[in-house]
Amino acid sequence: MQYTSGSTRNPAGVMITNEALVTDVLQINEALRFEAPMRIPTWLPQHHDMGVIVAILGVVLGQVLEIMSPRDFLQNPKRWVDKLSRRGDDPADVHIYTCIPNFALDLAARYAAPETPDQYDFSAVDCIIIGSESVTKPGVEAFVGAFGDSGLDRTVLRPSYGLAETTLLVSTDRTEDRPKFVEFDREALAQGKAVPAEDGVPMASNGQPVKWMHFAIVDTETKNELPEGEIGEIWVNGNNVAAGYLDRPEETEATFRNTIGTTLQDGLPKDNWCATGDLGTVLDDHLYITGRVKDLVVVAGRNHYPQDIEATAMEASDHVRKDSVAAFAVPGDDVERLIILAERADDATEEGDAAAEDAIRSAITTNHGISPEVVEFRAPGGVARSTAGKIARRVNAKQFTEREHAAAE
């Protein structure tokens, strides 16, 4: 039994079969091509799918994992960074593998950057899988900037996509130019198209689907497969897909028992597709994740991706703590209202809220053509997150709405 992270709803128990578990581990092994001797340092929580699969991989590969708790990492990111560095007792041909969410890149760069280039030796790092949340260009650049002179090869960073419903991995970048970022036209994105453009919205490639499964981008209304460059829901079909949700028959039917319509690929099965709830597109054999179906901010009939708005808010002011913004919509009298919740940076005070709010409003209006009804600042840790550390937009929206209703009574 593997529970979802709870970033979009209450955690659901996902029933992982032995077949799904073995299939996923084989898919990961084939995609990453592990080489011995190796070390696998990890701080991922063992109750989260990434942490569980890393632990099982250690068993399958016959490796002893170097485990620390998430608290150990968060209190001092250097503890994890130290383990990525080549040690005196490492074999000359050692390979180091690890797996992290995106926010760890910035934390490591900020709090564990070397004082001198020779403080670390990252030459043995073979792969850093980045998943669980959207991979951001600033996070990648900060990490490479901090550790590039210490022997870090940029191509070891591998943005990847997966979810509990498929046991874990769905895609990872296996090209030589990873990590790959493409900027997409914001207006086209709002219309369901992915069109590369200068000064657009940067998105990370999550690579190519793993072997031994079927994969399609599907129109959420017609259920037909969409061509390259069009945005739709990501559907997956294969032995890595879970059996369903525990004691949730209706949700199981809606998520795991889907029938695809017209297809463009040859040989696709008709039934038992898993609708992931994630929106994305494929362009030049690269998968790009654009958002969640249920997280879309729809104002005046236009689609806006919350992570895009959140990125704008973070870049608008140094008053905002990195990766600590929630953008969501709540019902209004005529149209939905855009709400922004942001945590203050560690060194920020309430006195700077007003100026930062003005900067955020101006940036969002300029870049997205909408104006937030509420911009609210909170202390660090004040924005709700899932058990995996991801911003829980729907939880924040529910709490915000409940608070408004309570205040009105």
What are these regions (language model features)?
Residues 204-214, 220-229, 233-299:
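Conserved ATP-binding/catalytic segment of the ANL
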Residues 1-23:
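Conserved AMP-binding A3 loop
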Residues 323-328, 339-340, 361-409:
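Conserved C-terminal "lid"/linker of ANL adenylate-forming enzymes
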Residues 85, 238, 243-244, 254, ...:
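AMP-binding/adenylate-forming catalytic core of the ANL superfamily
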Residues 92-98, 109-200, 214, 222-223:
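Gly/Ser/Thr-rich phosphate-binding loop
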Residues 22-39, 46-96, 111-114:
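Conserved AMP-binding/adenylation subdomain of ANL enzymes
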Residues 14, 18, 44-45, 70-73, ...:
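Hydrophobic alpha-helical scaffolding
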Residues 15-19, 30, 36-38, 42-44, ...:
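Motif- and composition-driven signal specific to adenylation
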